[in-house]
Amino acid sequence: MRYLPHSEADRAAMLATIGAASVEDLFRDVPREALDQAAFDALPDHGGEMEVERALSALAARNLTAGSVPCFLGAGSYRHHVPAAVDALIQRGEFLTSYTPYQAEVSQGTLQYLFEFQTQVALITGMEVANASMYDGATACAEAAAMAVRITRRRKVLMAGGLHPHYTATTQTLLACLGHEGEGLPPDPLALGDLIGRVGSDTACVIVQNPDFFGRLRDLSPLAEACHAAGALLVVAVCEPVSLGLVAPPGAMGADIVVAEGHALGSPTGFGGPGVGLFATREKYLRQMPGRLAGETLDESGKRGYVLTLSTREQHIRREKATSNICTNSGLIALAFTIHMTLLGEAGFTRLAWINHANAVALAEKLARVKGVKVLPETFFNEFTLRLPKPAAEVVEALAARSILAGVPVSRFLPTYPELANLLLVNATELTTPEDADALVAALKEVL
């Protein structure tokens, strides 16, 4: 294929169309030091494999890795033990792709695991039907908002203050492009009573997270009743899927759509990704659900087989009739999720959730005894918020110098809210040992 580069006129026309003054404007979100041309010019022209490996290893050694030091990071990306069998199985050549096969019925193994994935998601969320995965939790949340708009024929989406900021931003982006209204409430979470009062006749749906961004667990039943009384839908987002092994499923509390980030089961944290979006809903909304749905059937010989039952995306049907434009999806991460869940089993999943909660409670009790530290949420799963006597970012930096990954400052996600600067998100999982907790407590006493 002949290479035909864009001309200056082509580039100028494209920049004008999107409202950018220069190519550099496209990279304004990238830190300036990362775009320093002098740093690129200083790179050696070439190097042997050993030299390059040695140089990169030296750079990597400057980082603190979650597996080598006490780690309490969370805020939407949670570190759990992943059985070795998961990685071994997903690297089989038959599975090592993110694609749903175009000749779907030829790939019975892929369709079967997608069917099992859907079954697992429906069971843990307490819903009737689930799709074959979305890109990640945030995009699943955005698709849920768009789905609610289609179902209710209303244009306003209300997002609770406890919704993860990335989920809020992603949802607002999609709604703006579709010409709908997305209202994100202040991040200092409102009581459900206040949120209930905002639900009106123009509300398509209310989106809440449980446990929320700050770690709070709530009974969502009153909110669900208020939404349904107003003709709106309740969308529940779950960032930590392990919580569903212990907490009442959203479906049991009246949710109409449940979305979740599933990468904590089966995948390492990996700088927060890649993710896999879980999406479940009521059967009556099946045909408004985005993405794909794998189904079980019998062939002409009476043997069980699997098919793509629904694919209401623009590559399969007319664009104006499509429910989404999801393309290459997170099928491989969905497979990892499915294998991990299968290895755990129902009893193992529940036990894993109990261990997470117990470790978090033990950690919170120890931290609450540190002078100047207050544990904010009264009810939580495996993550909670600390109010510190000084900016959380400073504390995190000081503890990193002591080889402790203390948690995530809320200000990292919400920098425009100075009243939240002293809040620190702290997470504990089955990998958190009593020694890790003691190390964090001792270090906090030193730096506060």
UniProtKB/Swiss-Prot annotation:
Enzyme Commission number, as recorded: 1.4.4.2
One GO-annotated biological process of the protein: glycine decarboxylation via glycine cleavage system
Any matching Pfam family: GDC-P
Keyword Nuclease belongs to the record: no
An example Gene Ontology molecular-function term: glycine dehydrogenase (decarboxylating) activity
Keyword annotations from UniProtKB, A to Z: Oxidoreductase
Main enzyme class: oxidoreductase
Keyword Phosphoprotein annotated: no
Catalytic activity: N(6)-[(R)-lipoyl]-L-lysyl-[glycine-cleavage complex H protein] + glycine + H(+) = N(6)-[(R)-S(8)-aminomethyldihydrolipoyl]-L-lysyl-[glycine-cleavage complex H protein] + CO2
Subunit structure, as described in the record: The glycine cleavage system is composed of four proteins: P, T, L and H. In this organism, the P 'protein' is a heterodimer of two subunits.
Family: Belongs to the GcvP family. N-terminal subunit subfamily.
Function field: The glycine cleavage system catalyzes the degradation of glycine. The P protein binds the alpha-amino group of glycine through its pyridoxal phosphate cofactor; CO(2) is released and the remaining methylamine moiety is then transferred to the lipoamide cofactor of the H protein.
HAMAP family documented for this protein: GcvPA
Record PANTHER family: GLYCINE CLEAVAGE SYSTEM P-PROTEIN, GLYCINE DEHYDROGENASE (DECARBOXYLATING)
The protein's name: Probable glycine dehydrogenase (decarboxylating) subunit 1
Primary gene name: gcvPA
